[in-house]
Design a protein with these regions (language model features):
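Asp-based, Mg2+/Mn2+-dependent phosphohydrolase catalytic module
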Residues: 1-8, 38, 94-98, 119, ...
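N-terminal helical cap/lid subdomain that shapes the substrate entry/recognition surface
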Residues: 3-116, 143
Length: 231
């Protein structure tokens, strides 16, 4: 197999979300609200425990009766927002409007940072003539994140679940990305952190490689093996 294109997941693969405490601090600052340090830490820990930060890598604690919404959350912007604000609202905050503000914050480029080797690997792939796509289960437009961090120039196609009404592991989402890049699935490598969701590319005939969803400091070179797989 000759790899001619690589599809990447977004969160936990190319980018990592900011820590939950930083997420909460930013929203409180923007709202001109102050909490005593102990209360702020307690609230951040509670948000972390329920998995309120989308893409934060923590399995969520779902509100009762929300299982169906959880299963289809990435198929629409409305569903994604409704699910994650419902998760967040399990934690008491000093102003109820902060839950929507937290959701808005997580969509900002400032809330995300690329892994240390992301730019290096994307640049090397482009130098080798390998096409790059991003396939993400998500409820909002992540393109500004790539632009803000100077990585948009490497990406030939973005295939986002909410824009297509289908989500990984549905092979149709990966097929859409392959079609957009003009590369056959059997010449494509999918790279992601979710064994079930990203592993769905295998049903289409793509090779699949997994990385660990870890804080950036603990995964400085997690993407570099992709270059060896491409050859």
């Amino acid at each position: 197999m000759t790899i001619k294109s690589v599809l990447f997941d977004f969160s936990g693969t190319l980018f990592r979300a900011e820590p939950t405490e930083s997420w909460l601090r930013a929203v409180l600052r923007d709202a001109d609200l102050t909490l005593p340090e102990g209360e702020l830490t307690e609230a951040a820990d509670a948000l972390e425990a329920v998995g309120a930060l989308p893409g934060g890598g923590v399995a969520p604690r779902l509100p009762e009766g929300s299982e169906d919404l959880w299963r289809r959350r990435d198929q629409s912007a409305e569903g994604h927002r409704a699910m994650y604000t419902a998760i967040s609202r399990q934690v008491r905050l000093p102003d109820a409007r902060l839950h929507d503000a937290l959701y808005e914050r997580h969509m900002l480029p400032a809330a995300w940072g690329p892994y240390p080797d992301t730019a290096e690997v994307l640049d090397a792939l482009c130098e080798r003539g390998v096409a790059v796509g991003v396939v993400s289960n998500i409820g909002w437009d992540l393109r500004p994140v790539f632009r803000e961090h100077g990585l948009d120039r490497y990406v030939g196609a973005y295939v986002l679940s909410y824009e297509h009404g289908i989500q990984k592991p549905d092979p149709r989402l990966f097929a859409t990305a392959c079609d957009a890049l003009g590369i056959a699935p059997e010449d494509t490598l999918m790279v992601g952190d979710d064994r079930r969701a990203d592993g769905g590319a295998a049903a289409l005939g793509c090779a699949v490689h997994f990385v660990d969803h870890l804080p950036a400091a603990r995964r400085p070179e997690g993407l570099r093996p992709v270059l060896d797989l491409v050859g």
